[in-house]
Amino acid sequence: MSKEELKRAAAARALEYVSDGMQLGLGTGSTAKHFVELLGERVRAGLRVVGVPTSEGTRADAERCGVPLTTLDDVDHLDLTVDGADEIAPSLDVIKGGGGALLREKIVAAASTRMVVISDDSKWVETLGRFPLPVEVIPFGLGATRRALATAFAEAGVTGEITLRQGPDGHAFVTDGGHWILDAHLGRIPEPPRLAALLSAIPGVVEHGLFIGLAKTAILAGSQGIRIVDRPRGRV
């Protein structure tokens, strides 16, 4: 199977977690797009759900596929969020944000009773960090924020190049919230919860791509089939 076929297989399995009447968080990225498309097929067959999109791109996909939408202002909770991931550790802590939607993705995930991450099995890693860690920042004071990030990385025992993400036009990539993204090429993050706390304390940092304690289940598609991993007992 191709990588896209594996992503679609993981998305199809995630549909088994969806029940009639659910309020859903709809993730962003290529794997989440497969889920939205398959969900649309179920909706056309009579499934009643509403979704909260995590990006303008996902909103457009959901509207195209006929998935009814709502907002977090109009519902008091979400039953389930299904989203992709850039890296998944055995703890089910993940790195997300390669598509630039990490702020809305984290807000939606935190508002959900359950978060399921879906991917092909190449995203499964023993230690997070090979994928660049996205940090969403306010454009104002960028130099000061970069210096504070470097200090936080050193305190967490990691180091690496910090680059400003660029869009197709060669200018700074702008998120749906009007912010910029710094990508930290760290290689390895031995203590993700500690680094997450340090990053969250930096003025100028809006959000970061470490999703700690949010995912409850991972669905991984590989050449040997589907593997389902639940968060280890004792983890928050």
Swiss-Prot record:
Keyword terms: Isomerase
Catalysed reactions, semicolon-separated: aldehydo-D-ribose 5-phosphate = D-ribulose 5-phosphate
Superkingdom: Bacteria
GO molecular function: ribose-5-phosphate isomerase activity
Biological process, per Gene Ontology: pentose-phosphate shunt, non-oxidative branch
Its EC number(s): 5.3.1.6
Positions annotated to bind substrate: T28, G29, S30, T31, D83, G84, A85, D86, K96, G97, G98, G99, K123
Enzyme class: isomerase
Active site: E105
Short name of any one Pfam family annotated for the protein: Rib_5-P_isom_A
Pathway annotation from the record: Carbohydrate degradation; pentose phosphate pathway; D-ribose 5-phosphate from D-ribulose 5-phosphate (non-oxidative stage): step 1/1
Family note: Belongs to the ribose 5-phosphate isomerase family.
Subunit structure: Homodimer.
Function: Catalyzes the reversible conversion of ribose-5-phosphate to ribulose 5-phosphate.
The protein's name: Ribose-5-phosphate isomerase A
Species: Afipia carboxidovorans (strain ATCC 49405 / DSM 1227 / KCTC 32145 / OM5)
Phylogenetic placement of the source organism: Bacteria, Pseudomonadati, Pseudomonadota, Alphaproteobacteria, Hyphomicrobiales
